[in-house]
Curated annotation (Swiss-Prot):
Name of the protein: Purine nucleoside phosphorylase DeoD-type
Subunit composition and interactions: Homohexamer; trimer of homodimers.
Protein keywords: Glycosyltransferase, Transferase
Keyword Nucleotide-binding attributed: no
Domain of life: Bacteria
Residues that, per the record, bind a purine D-ribonucleoside: 5, 180-182, 204-205
Organism encoding this protein: Aliivibrio salmonicida (strain LFI1238) (Vibrio salmonicida (strain LFI1238))
Length: 236
């Protein structure tokens, strides 16, 4: 039945849901990548859709910005609607010298400055990691599609405009590839509820070098990321 944040019914969602932050991006994915699409929810304009990709049922839904927002939607999708696999599809700002604009980054693990995971783990650190099966499948599909990917740790930040600019140097030293705002929270919720999760990101800007994609290049890199995510989804 419907929840306070998702006005859908059990069975409306596929077992695998792709989740961008922007609900309009979810709409774009549904209209441009899926077939036989049905809109299944729209509370607070957080749109969700279910359709097919190459004949297999797939859903897509926005999750908003930041760990508190995404955790609400991920929790309800898994706990109330029986979703088994969450694949976040979004963008990140690179901090590592080996990462270039338009690269696809797959978050094997996610560090964070958020306290949300510690609150849910008796104030201990939680190792927020992707499901290995999803990770392995995504890497294999990327290689098959000749899409260059970087696999490693990302950093899920609470602040978009952070005053701690020196932290980026520390991130690079520790091998962190890029910064998003949700992966660590999604991984924790999925682990808590016995589901699987993965984060696939496209590099839209390089924080340390001050580089940014043009709108045209941003769309191309997004399409590459989405193809990897969808090809992964239909293998599950």
């Amino acid at each position: 039945m419907a929840t306070p944040h998702i006005n859908a019914q059990v069975g409306d969602f596929a077992e695998t849901v792709l989740m961008p932050g922007d609900p309009l991006r979810a709409k774009f994915i549904a209209e441009n990548f899926l077939e036989d699409v049905t809109q299944v929810c729209d509370v607070r304009n957080m749109f969700g859709y279910t359709g097919t990709y190459k004949g297999k049922k797939v859903s897509v839904m926005g999750h908003g910005m930041g760990i508190p927002s995404c955790c609400i939607y991920v929790h309800e999708l898994i706990a109330e609607f029986g979703v088994k696999n969450i694949i976040r599809v979004g963008s990140c700002g690179a901090v590592h010298d080996d990462v270039k604009l338009m690269d696809v980054v797959i978050g094997m693990g996610a560090s964070t400055d958020s306290k949300v995971n510690r609150i849910r783990f008796n104030n201990h650190d939680f190792a927020a990691i992707a499901d290995f099966g999803l990770l392995e499948t995504a890497v294999a599909q990327a290689r098959k599609l000749n899409v260059p990917v970087k696999v490693g740790n990302v950093f899920s930040a609470d602040l978009f405009y952070s005053p701690e600019t020196d932290l980026f140097d520390k991130m690079e030293k520790l091998g962190i590839l890029g910064v998003d705002m949700e992966a660590a929270g999604i991984y924790r919720v999925a682990a808590d509820l016995g589901a699987k999760a993965l984060t696939i990101l496209t590099v839209s800007d390089h924080i340390k070098r001050g580089e940014k994609l043009s709108s045209e290049d941003r769309q191309k890199s997004f399409n590459d990321m989405m193809t990897v995510a969808l090809e992964t989804a239909i293998k599950l």
